[in-house]
Design a protein with these regions (language model features):
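Alpha-helical transmembrane segments in inner-membrane proteins
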Residues: 2-346
Length: 346
C-alpha cells in the first residue's frame, strides 16, 4: 500500500494527504496502463474473445490490424498529447504562481491552430505531415515571441497580458481564414482540426510529436527547482541566487514546445492542462517541482479516458476530443474559480 502522510491545512489550500512521489507515479502509471488496455480493447468495431486471441497471436490478421494499427496508435497519441498538456499546465501554474493558468495562457495554442488553418486553406493537406508542421511552426513563432518577452520583463502579469493578446490575435486571424476560405470543404476541415481529435492517428504521428515533446519536457524539468524556489516569492528567490530570466525562458520555451507539439498532433484541446495539475496537487504537498511528472501522467490518463468516452458514447458521428474535454472541463474550471474566489476573500 502507498505510504500516506497526513498534513493539516485549510480547505482548498492544496494541503492534505501527501504521497511519496515514486509511489504516486507508480500508481498513476498502473492506472494509465489499465485504462490504455481497456481503450485498445473497446471501440466501434466489437471483437470476440477468439478475435482478441487471433490479434495477439497474429498481429497482421484483420483483428490484429484493428488493435495494433488503429486503436493502439490512437491511444498512444492521446497519452502523449495529454502528458504534454498536463506537464505544460503544471509548469505555467508554477511560473505564474496562479492555479488557474493553463497552456493556452501563452497564446501558443491559438497561433498553432492558425498555422494548421492556413495550411488546410492553402490546400497543403494533401502533403503528408504538412498540417502538423504548420501547426508546430506557428507554435514555435508564438513561443519565440513569448520567450523574448519573458526574458525582458519581470512581472508575470505582463506575460499573461501578452498571452491574452496573442490568443486574441490568433483567434481573429483564424476567423479571417474561415471568412476568406474559398472552399466549404476546407472550412469544414479547419473546423474539425480546431475541435481536436486523435482519430486516424498512427505511429508516425506519435514519432513526429515525440521529439519536440521530449525537448520541452527536459526544459520544464530543468525549471523545476526554480519553480519550487519561486513559491517563496520572486524577491526572495532572486536574493537566493535564482536566475529569474533563465527560469522564465526555460519554463516558457518548454511549455511552448509541449503545447505546440500537442496541437500539431491532435488539434486544439482545452482544459486538460488546467485540470491535470489539480488532480494531484494535494498529493505532492503543493510543491511545483514534485507536481510536474504526476501532472503529466494525470494529463495522459485524462485524455485517454476522454478519447475512450468519445468513441463509446453512442452518437451518429464520433464526438471530437476537444468537445468532450470542454464539456467536462468547463464545470471543473468554474468550480476552481469559485474555490479560488473564496480563498481570495478569506
Amino acid at each position: 500500500m502507498p505510504r500516506l502522510v497526513r498534513r493539516r491545512g485549510r480547505p482548498g489550500s492544496g494541503q492534505g494527504v501527501a504521497m511519496s512521489l515514486p509511489r504516486l507515479c507508480l500508481a498513476m502509471i498502473l492506472a494509465l496502463s489499465g485504462v490504455a488496455v481497456v481503450a485498445i480493447c473497446l471501440g466501434e468495431t466489437p471483437l470476440t474473445l477468439a478475435q482478441y486471441a487471433q490479434a495477439l497471436a497474429h498481429p497482421a490478421s484483420p483483428p490484429g490490424e484493428v488493435l495494433w494499427s488503429i486503436r493502439a496508435p490512437r491511444v498512444l497519441v492521446a497519452a502523449l498529447v495529454g502528458a504534454a498538456l498536463g506537464l505544460s499546465g503544471a509548469t505555467m501554474q508554477g511560473l505564474l504562481r496562479n492555479p488557474l493558468a493553463d497552456p493556452g495562457v501563452l497564446g501558443v495554442s491559438a497561433v498553432s491552430g492558425l498555422g494548421a488553418a492556413l495550411a488546410i486553406s492553402m490546400g497543403l493537406a494533401v502533403l503528408p505531415g504538412a498540417i502538423e508542421l504548420a501547426a508546430l511552426a506557428g507554435a514555435l513563432v508564438a513561443g519565440a515571441l513569448v520567450v523574448v518577452l519573458a526574458a525582458r520583463f519581470r512581472e508575470p502579469e505582463a506575460l499573461i497580458l501578452f498571452g491574452v493578446a496573442l490568443s486574441a490575435l490568433g483567434g481573429a486571424l483564424t476567423a479571417l481564414v474561415f471568412n476568406l476560405s474559398p472552399s466549404p470543404v476546407a472550412t469544414a476541415e479547419v473546423m474539425a482540426w480546431l475541435m481536436g481529435s486523435v482519430q486516424n492517428r498512427d505511429a508516425l504521428d506519435a514519432l513526429r510529436a515525440l521529439v519536440p515533446m521530449t525537448i520541452g519536457a527536459i526544459l520544464c524539468a530543468r525549471a523545476g527547482r526554480g519553480l519550487r524556489m519561486l513559491t517563496l516569492g520572486e524577491e526572495v528567490a532572486r536574493m537566493s541566487g535564482l536566475p529569474m530570466a533563465r527560469l522564465r525562458v526555460q519554463a516558457v520555451a518548454g511549455s511552448a514546445l509541449l503545447t505546440g507539439a500537442a496541437v500539431a498532433a491532435a488539434g486544439v484541446i482545452g482544459f486538460v492542462g488546467l485540470a491535470a495539475p489539480h488532480l494531484v496537487r494535494a498529493l505532492v504537498r503543493d510543491d511545483p517541482k514534485r507536481l510536474l511528472w504526476p501532472s503529466a501522467l494525470a494529463g495522459a490518463l485524462l485524455l485517454v479516458l476522454a478519447d475512450l468516452a468519445a468513441r463509446v458514447i453512442p452518437t451518429e458521428q464520433e464526438l471530437k476530443l476537444g468537445v468532450v474535454t470542454a464539456l467536462f472541463g468547463a464545470p471543473a474550471f468554474a468550480l476552481l474559480a469559485w474555490r479560488a474566489s473564496r480563498s481570495w476573500r478569506s
